[in-house]
Amino acid sequence: MISHFLNFLKFNGTPGEYGSPLWATVYILVIFGVASVAVMLMTYLERKVLAHMQIRLGPMRVGPHGLLQPIADALKLLIKEDIVPDGADKFLFWMAPVTVMMTAFTTYLVIPFGRSHAVTDMNIGVLFMIGISSLGVLAVVMAGWSSNSKYALMGGLRSAAQMVSYEVAMGLAIVSVLMMTSLQTGTGTLSMIGIVQAQQAQGSWFIFKFFPTGLVAFVIFAIAMVAETNRAPFDLPEAESELTAGFHTEYSGFRWSLFFLGEYVAMIAVSSIAVTLWLGGWLRPFPNALSGATWDFAFSVFPALLFFVLAAGCFIGWVRMPSKPAFKVQAIGLGIFGVLLGMIGAVLLIPAVRVRVSDIFWFSAKVGVFMYLYIWYRGTFPRYRFDQLMKIGWKVLLPVSLGVLIVTAVLGVRHELIAGLMGVAR
C-alpha cells in the first residue's frame, strides 16, 4: 500500500491517467470535504465583509470573533423540523435539493487545481462542464413545480428564463477561448488542462489575448456566471421582496441547507472555470516573463511564508489580548490557531509538498478574488427588475458576445497568416 502511494506521488498526472479507481475516489472525497469546508468559510466571510460594508461587526458571539458561527448554523439546520407541504409532489420535492447539490459537485470532476490535481483530464471537459452546470436549473424548476406554491413556481420559471438568456452569451464567450487555444497548434482543445497549457505555451493569459477582445469575453462570462448562480444583483428566482423566498419558499431544515450548499459550491465551481479559461488556472503570476529556477523557488515558497506571517499575526494578537478571564478562551484559541498555521507553513517548506501545493495555492488565490467579488456585488448593487435582466441578456450580452467571437476569429486568422509568412521567410 505504501509503495502504491509513493508511486502515485511520483506520477505527474491525474488519477484518471494513472488508471487507479482508488485514487480517483480519494480525490472525489477530498474535493467534497474541502468544498464543504470552503462553503462554511465563505458564509462566515460574507457575513463579516457585508457587516463591515454597513459599519457593523457581524457575528461575534460563537467563538472568537464569531469563527464558529458557520458550525452553529449547520447544526441548527440539521436539527430543524423538515416540513413537506400538503399537495406537494413528494418525490420531486425530495429530489430537487439533492439534484442541485449533485450537479454543483459533479462539475469539479473536470476542474484542474493543478497539472496533477484533477480527478480526470477529460478530452471534452468544457462540453461536460457546460452540460452539467446547465442541469442545475432543471432542479430549480423541479423544486418550484413540486412545492405546490405560486411563489415557488414563479421562482422556478424565472430561473429557467434567466438561464436561457445568459447561457447563450456565456457559451459564445467560452467558444472564443477555444478558438484561442488553436493559435499555435492549429487544433483547439476541449480539455481544461489543455486550455491552461495553451496559455502557458502562448506566454499570455487569455484575458489579455487580442486585447481587449479577451477581456470583453471574460467580463461577459463574469456577468453571466453571477446570473447562472442566482446571486445578487441577479437573484430574481429567490427575490425576498417579491416571492418570499422563491423556489425554496416551502423548504426548511436539511433540504433547505442542500440548496444553500449547492449555491455556494456552484459559485466556487464557476469561479474555478473562469480562472481556468482566462486567468491561467494553476499557473503562478508571470510564468514566462519571470522564468528560471530562482523565480520558481521564490513563488513556490510564498505560500509557506504567508502562513508564517498569519501565524505571527495570531501570536501578536495573543500577546496584546487583555489578561482578563473573559478573554481567556479567545486567547487560548488564538494561540492554538497560530501554532497550527505555523505547522502548516513548516510542512509547506518540504520540497515534495512545496511543488505540489504551489499550484493549488495560486489557483485558490485567484478563486478567492472571485468569491470576494460575489460578496462585493451583493453589498453594492440593487436587484434588477426581471424585464431589465432579460434586456441585458438578450440586447447587450448576446450581441457583444457575437461580436467578440467574430473579432477573435478574424484576429486569429490574421495571427496564423502572419506566423505562416514569417515561417516561409525563414
UniProtKB/Swiss-Prot annotation:
It is an enzyme of class 7 (translocase). It comes from Koribacter versatilis (strain Ellin345). Keywords: Cell inner membrane, Cell membrane, Membrane, NAD, Quinone, Translocase, Transmembrane, Transmembrane helix, Ubiquinone. One of its GO terms (cellular component) is plasma membrane. PROSITE patterns: COMPLEX1_ND1_1, COMPLEX1_ND1_2. It is a multi-pass membrane protein. One of its GO terms (molecular function) is NADH dehydrogenase activity. This is NADH-quinone oxidoreductase subunit H 1. Belongs to the complex I subunit 1 family. It comes from the Bacteria. It catalyses: a quinone + NADH + 5 H(+)(in) = a quinol + NAD(+) + 4 H(+)(out). The keyword Transmembrane helix applies.
